[in-house]
Swiss-Prot record:
The active site is at 65, 138. Its EC number is 1.11.1.6. The gene is PXP9. The keyword Membrane does not apply. The lineage of its organism: Eukaryota, Fungi, Dikarya, Ascomycota, Saccharomycotina. Pfam families: Catalase (PF00199), Catalase-rel (PF06628). It is found in: Peroxisome matrix. This is Peroxisomal catalase. Heme binds at residue 348.
Amino acid sequence: MSNPPVFTTSQGCPVSDPFTTQRIPLDSTGYKYAPPIGPLLLQDFKLIDTLSHFDRERIPERVVHAKGAGAYGVFEVTDDITDVCSAKFLDTVGKKTRIFTRFSTVGGEKGSADTARDPRGFATKFYTEDGNLDLVYNNTPIFFIRDPIKFPHFIHTQKRNPATNLKDPNMFWDYLTANDESLHQVMYLFSNRGTPASYRTMNGYSGHTYKWYNSKGEWVYVQVHFIANQGVHNLLDEEAGRLAGEDPDHSTRDLWEAIEKGDYPSWECYIQTMTLEQSKKLPFSVFDLTKVWPHKDFPLRHFGRFTLNENPKNYYAETEQIAFSPSHTVPGMEPSNDPVLQSRLFSYPDTHRHRLGPNYHQIPVNCPLKSGSFNPINRDGPMCVDGNLGGTPNYANAYNCPIQYAVSPKASGNKPDEKYTGEVVPYHWEHTDYDYFQPKMFWKVLGRTPGEQESLVKNVANHVSAADEFIQDRVYEYFSKAEPIIGDLIRKKVQELKRKASSPSKI
């Protein structure tokens, strides 16, 4: 057995007692008992070293997805999809790639409850031979917005009122009812699917449309689905509320304990594909994040499985400091023109640079350890700890440091790329009747399972009953655009709650 480590200062100086401080005794004359000890000394490096580091322990929490849990695992290719994608990590059935997945809530702070009614983040980093690939998904196949500039507005309404610092139902519903494209996601959120029973028992969806291309340069639009082998299980509103009080870290604990005892969660991986010509025949834009692709027209195709089988050794170093971005991609995959996705390509690395520093890619959990990295331009900056490429010239030079470059992917084959014409215009997505069609279909899907429609009505009513009456009226109208009966049922439920609140309680 090796000797235990020696306690030291940050500079490696051995410490005999971690709790002593340097002080000057007072003159003990006249003191009946032990005299008080005098002032501290600024020269006490051990004390200053300890306190100054403690003062800087916290970094900014994520502006969204602050509360999360993660684990390492392995992805395995189960089916050949090289006709669709030329990414090397997908080129052979049976091939395995190390991954890290982080689950999270969206709107809450780091100390908030895991069971809050909120979408769940579902982000996975693949450590591939062509660099790191990040698939930054949610547990819902759609989202609240499709105009990216609305994102800060939307998120502010889901957080705290700037005056009261309280969650504000008026803010929450004021924004949503003024932006009808949110209806599909809001119905999903206020169904029981808005409160997953655990991170292990929920699916993951790309939501966005991506473009994948094969070795010939032929490309298709793609949506990705992760389907939980544990099944999908949700909480009723009452259960979620109870757990928020009794065990606010319920989902974090559930994931950790399952992996610790060898009950490894896994997900099957599927894609939907669509050609450019097929996209032109859709009743909605292929780049609309508030819509799903009908499975009967675009069936699921299996391509892999991933299993989470290793808990992090240190939450801060790994789960907290891991940095995901949809711009972290590999050859064979690229973003589409989905405007919300395009905005995330900038925003995610930008917030990492703010939160973790410009060299966040050097943090071990973010390093492309399998492929390595070499870019003589990216040098220096705060916390550059990788050797800074030594004396290598800091430009692409052919003089004394020849560099190899990757082979460019082949140009498109028989499938043409999108064509862009016209002038730059200010664009704001306009609502159409189809914006209410998929919410209407979702209401019918809920009707296939007893109690699901009733849960949606009750969950909305419980939330909006705290809002002002004119906001409530807007909520009834909002849901009625999907199906008039939904607005009527919510109105009746809110009125019932008001009567109960106003009636004298019996002792």
